[in-house]
């Protein structure tokens, strides 16, 4: 019973902690005014980059994909698709930097690339877990989409990585 309880605790933290970190991106303290300001753009940008990366990787991989990324884990992902997804995210980061200039273009590009790398890693990690457990989908709440975890697997590693990236960038 304690093994089941600890497994549930780890699972819940694995999913809940990254999404709780979205608050770090959304709320910014203003020391001069002694209050916090809310900005939804940074948390939303993580999801935009994830969606652009997934869509760009899928389309590029379908057109040009020849070299498998990690065939044993996710047989349909290719290096060409992964690079294509990254290129589409860089384009999206230029657009975001134009419409939301509170960060430089370079910081937006760095954020996009951070999300690409860690989002892909999160997707592969979840695919590996499912493969090891012998399950196809992580749930049936979204028929044909593999479950809720499949919709957000990229964000589970991308959000903490984005928080660390933006914190490190703010130090320099």
Language-model features and meaning:
Residues 1-10:
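Single conserved hydrophobic/aromatic residue that forms the stacking wall/gate
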Residues 11-56, 61-62, 67, 71, ...:
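Hydrophobic alpha-helical transmembrane segments
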